[in-house]
UniProtKB/Swiss-Prot annotation:
The active site is at 410. This is Urocanate hydratase. It comes from Bradyrhizobium diazoefficiens (strain JCM 10833 / BCRC 13528 / IAM 13628 / NBRC 14792 / USDA 110). Catalyzes the conversion of urocanate to 4-imidazolone-5-propionate. Pathway: Amino-acid degradation; L-histidine degradation into L-glutamate; N-formimidoyl-L-glutamate from L-histidine: step 2/3. GO terms for biological process: L-histidine catabolic process; L-histidine catabolic process to glutamate and formamide; L-histidine catabolic process to glutamate and formate. The lineage of its organism: Bacteria, Pseudomonadati, Pseudomonadota, Alphaproteobacteria, Hyphomicrobiales.
Length: 556
């Protein structure tokens, strides 16, 4: 019996003000857990898989049922502990403590290998939580669309005089994270050709408006890119195929995209990357019968994929790793210069991290889109001079379809997050919003992750692999009063390559919530400024001084 498969269930978060838990502080994690498994949100909800290969919301269906039952009974001075998707304890704490503490996929470093994780996973002792799957704050592809948009815009500034009009981007992967790429590209003014091996993913991105159309052949896709370059009208096109075949073919043809990247689930060579020449049926069967053969074949294919990216890079085409660890996988198979092209964080995003700017997000527990539109307006009111942010919010309202509970992603930093959170809480208190909102973020943030091949790649002081920082971030968020806090391993880049922390706080309109929000939404981004100031980044040092952070190791 497969305890992780239930084709008879359809999970959707409740809407409205009626709650089945004892307070909004426990109703909120209940709804967000359920929202992660909404069919409009999750990739394979019947298997509890939310996104990112096998990133799950709960370890198995029995654990899911026990978590939901525990949340409904939880008192406002109790804390539920989750160990890799399984509820293991309820303890008396206090009203300002987190209601839920989550640890996912954490393994003692010497044993933190994919093989050992898979053994534990098969035994039912662990699950892969990715970043926001197991921490219950995934909001669909919107969750990464602004970060991807900001990256593409910055590429345009650096390489193309500030405009991507008439340019096109080559990428692969249209899963939960990669599915944001086509919309991010067209919002940034560029066209995109996205290669995807699974028809269902292309269909989902078409259905949700993230992808404009599908091409039947590579020739058709290239013709569309050529026409869009002439007209300077941005369009996104999905092509069913394998990137390990399509990317090298484009190199052979002498085709020159304007930007090259990739968001396949290469971090998981068994469950996330289809080997070249294999059918989906072959892949699925072999994953169960001979996972090592799948891993070898996948990594061999990644070598061809990355070599093509290196070839584009050698031609002077901006080429970037978008954080799926594909360079590492190729290097492991003998491609020595796999890291010749950069990751997106050191190349384009780190200056934002130095100021604590990152993927702030919130979701309306009412289920009413109007609550999000009202909060959009409040963000504009409180940040009247940030025209770039206003433009983002306008485009998001016009072009992003909500998946599950209505939500918004909005990159803001230290000094702004707590102001927005307090304003949202006041809107709930005054009845301007129909129900409370939850405020969280991706684990991909300035102070909450150690990932030497992604967020902390090429740190100025060489501290790429120091993972004290996400541990401190999680501990501080617990002490500050976040509603739930998570500490994960392996998200984004795979087992053995990252540690990271998440937090969510509920704005329920109470004065007590306001105090917690003020602490959490100041302290959380401040750890990012602290981390980068400690590494010697002048932007972060200046920000720390400007914001009055007390950093004892920072010279006065």
């Amino acid at each position: 019996m497969n305890r992780r498969l239930d084709n008879d269930r359809t999970i959707r978060a409740p809407r409205g003000r009626d709650i089945s838990a004892k307070s909004w502080l426990t109703e909120a994690p209940l709804r967000m857990l359920m929202n992660n498994l909404d069919p409009d949100v999750a990739e394979r909800p019947s298997e509890l898989v939310v996104y990112g290969g096998i990133g799950r919301a709960a370890r198995d269906w029995e654990s899911f049922d026990r978590i939901t039952a525990a949340l409904r009974k939880l008192e406002d001075d109790e804390t539920l502990l989750i160990q890799s998707g399984k509820p293991v304890g309820v303890f008396r704490t206090h009203a300002d403590a987190p209601r839920v503490l989550i640890a996912n996929s954490n393994i003692v470093p010497h044993w933190a290998t994919l093989d050992h994780f898979n053994e534990l996973d098969r035994k039912g002792l662990m699950m892969y939580g990715q970043m926001t799957a197991g921490s219950w704050i995934y909001i669909g592809s919107q969750g990464i669309v602004q970060g991807t948009y900001e990256t593409f815009v910055e590429v345009g500034r650096r390489h193309y005089g500030g405009s991507l009009a008439g340019k096109w981007i080559l990428t692969a992967g249209l899963g939960g994270m990669g599915g944001a790429q086509p919309l991010a590209a067209t919002m940034a003014g560029a066209s995109m050709l996205a290669v995807e091996c699974q028809p269902s993913r292309i269909e989902m991105r078409l259905r949700t408006g993230y992808l404009d159309r599908q091409a039947a052949t590579l020739d058709e896709a290239l013709a569309i890119m050529e026409e869009s370059a002439k007209t300077k009208k941005a369009i996104s096109v999905g092509l069913l195929g394998n990137a390990a075949e399509i990317f090298p073919e484009l190199v052979r043809r002498g085709v020159k995209p304007d930007i090259v990247t990739d968001q396949t689930s290469a971090h998981d060579p068994i469950n996330g990357y289809l080997p070249k020449g294999w059918t989906l049926a072959d892949w699925e069967a072999k994953r169960a019968s001979d996972p090592k053969a799948v891993e070898r074949a996948s990594k061999t294919s990644m070598v061809e994929h990355v070599q093509a990216m290196l070839d584009f890079h050698a031609q002077g085409i901006p080429t970037l790793d978008y954080g799926n660890n594909i360079r590492q996988m190729a290097q492991d198979m003998g491609l020595k210069n796999a890291f010749d092209f950069p990751g997106f964080v050191p190349a384009y995003i780190r200056p934002l991290f130095c100021r604590g700017v990152g993927p702030f997000r919130w979701a309306a527990l009412s289920g009413d889109p109007e609550d999000i539109f009202k909060t959009d307006a409040k963000v504009k009111e409180l940040m009247p001079d940030d025209k770039h942010l206003h433009n983002w919010l306008d485009m998001a309202r016009e072009r992003i379809k909500f998946q599950g509970l209505p939500a918004r992603i909005c990159w803001v930093g230290l000094g702004d997050r707590h102001r927005l959170g307090l304003a949202f809480n006041e809107m709930v208190a005054r009845g301007e919003l129909k129900a409370p909102v939850v405020i969280g973020r991706d684990h991909l943030d300035s102070g909450s992750v150690a990932s030497p091949n992604r967020e902390t790649e090429a740190m100025k002081d060489g501290s790429d692999a120091v993972s004290d920082w996400p541990l401190l971030n999680a501990l501080l968020n617990c002490a500050s009063g976040a509603t739930w806090v998570s500490l994960h391993h392996g998200g984004g880049v795979g087992i053995g390559y990252s540690q990271h922390a998440g937090m969510v706080i509920v704005a329920d309109g109470t004065p007590e919530a306001a105090k917690r929000i003020a602490r959490v939404l100041w302290n959380d981004p401040a750890t990012g400024v602290m981390r980068h100031a400690d590494a010697g980044y002048d932007i972060a040092i200046d920000c720390a001084r400007d914001k009055g952070l007390d950093l004892p190791s920072l010279s006065k």
